[in-house]
Amino acid sequence: MDSANLHQLQDQLQLVGSSSSSSSLDNNSDPSCYGASSAHQWSPGGISLNSVSLSHNYNNEMLNTRAHNNNNNNNTSECMSLSSIHNHSLIQQQDFPLQWPHDQSSYQHHEGLLKIKEELSSSTISDHQEGISKFTDMLNSPVITNYLKINEHKDYTEKLLLKSMSSGFPINGDYGSSLPSSSSSSSPSSQSHRGNFSQIYPSVNISSLSESRKMSMDDMSNISRPFDINMQVFDGRLFEGNVLVPPFNAQEISSLGMSRGSLPSFGLPFHHHLQQTLPHLSSSPTHQMEMFSNEPQTSEGKRHNFLMATKAGENASKKPRVESRSSCPPFKVRKEKLGDRIAALQQLVSPFGKTDTASVLMEAIGYIKFLQSQIETLSVPYMRASRNRPGKASQLVSQSQEGDEEETRDLRSRGLCLVPLSCMTYVTGDGGDGGGGVGTGFWPTPPGFGGGT
């Protein structure tokens, strides 16, 4: 309702009040107006009104006054306004009575009531809009979305669990209650199917035993995961035969059995199901080798450095060998010299036509031993004269006495000629001036030999 229309309505109501008073006193107005005013006298008693009916009647009054202003008929507008005011007496009784004094203050009071109603309606609309906005904000909040996702995940996992359990073996009851325990396993149906498979019915929720320590309490505390088997998943490693599977995050772990529409049954091994559901996780050999260490790059660097250090040590140990070989003469030169020496030994030893290296060397060794024994035999009488070392001299004498005959025989067999001492006067110095006039010989006279032979 516009402010201009309200002022116009107030003016019209004032005119209506003045015309009604003049018509009741003078009786000079229009007959229709006179009949309306005379037939229905105004009473000062209380009239029960409602703000809703008042607003409806005010709208009728505005329409009537606008129509009469266009026709420029003031008398008709006064009569219509009187008839509209007269209609207030026919309103039903409501909850609260309101006194109706027919003056300008009453209309102002009702106008205030209308304003209060409009304010209340606008406030209720704004509160309703704010409530709707708050409700939408609550729906869009991450807490509600997480809760809805968790509920959907629970429903989906329960359906998958029922499907896999029903495909694997019969179950009494549903998944909403706990799985059949020892009390329910004694039923006839469970006993009848007990011989067909060797599975064990768990009596507790598996998801309560397989909660990960690495999962945060804010994100995944309310999610129940049946068949989240805690073998080596939450340690970050899964072994599939001899193949090392890389670590999973929480979402991949929760969706292990969901990619093909059913979870693995209890009878099948876990890695067999992984071979079906995770073919894309077969990694290269280099990646598998990197997964054995917590820090692959640092371990590879350490291995490379270690290999380089070992190679450097081996090279350092091999260098002196190479230098020693280079310092020696070539192999051909050594072979030629050895051949010449072997030929010289063959001429000295004369191994009876044997020209091979082994026989020549054996004959040379035997000849050297023979020469050593002869030197020892000839030096025995001279060693007796030295009294400084009696122990050693006695040992030598005993050895010479034991092998005297054998050695002499050996010398004779070898063709050694023994010269008599009389003939060796130039050596011993026993004779006169013979033998070059040398008075003293090179060798002293042995004590046991007194005369010549």
Swiss-Prot record:
The entry's keywords: DNA-binding, Nucleus, Transcription, Transcription regulation
Highest taxon of source: Eukaryota
PROSITE patterns linked to this entry: BHLH
Molecular functions per Gene Ontology: DNA binding; DNA-binding transcription factor activity; protein dimerization activity
Gene3D superfamilies attached to this UniProt entry: Helix-loop-helix DNA-binding domain
Residue ranges of the region described as Disordered: 1-37, 177-197, 386-411
Domain called bHLH: residue spans: 322-371
Record keyword Transcription regulation present: yes
Major place of residence: nucleus
Subunit structure: Homodimer.
InterPro entries: bHLH95_bHLH, bHLH_dom, HLH_DNA-bd_sf, IND-like
GO CC annotation terms, alphabetical: nucleus
Designated name of the protein: Transcription factor bHLH110
Extent of Low complexity compositional bias: 8-32, 177-192
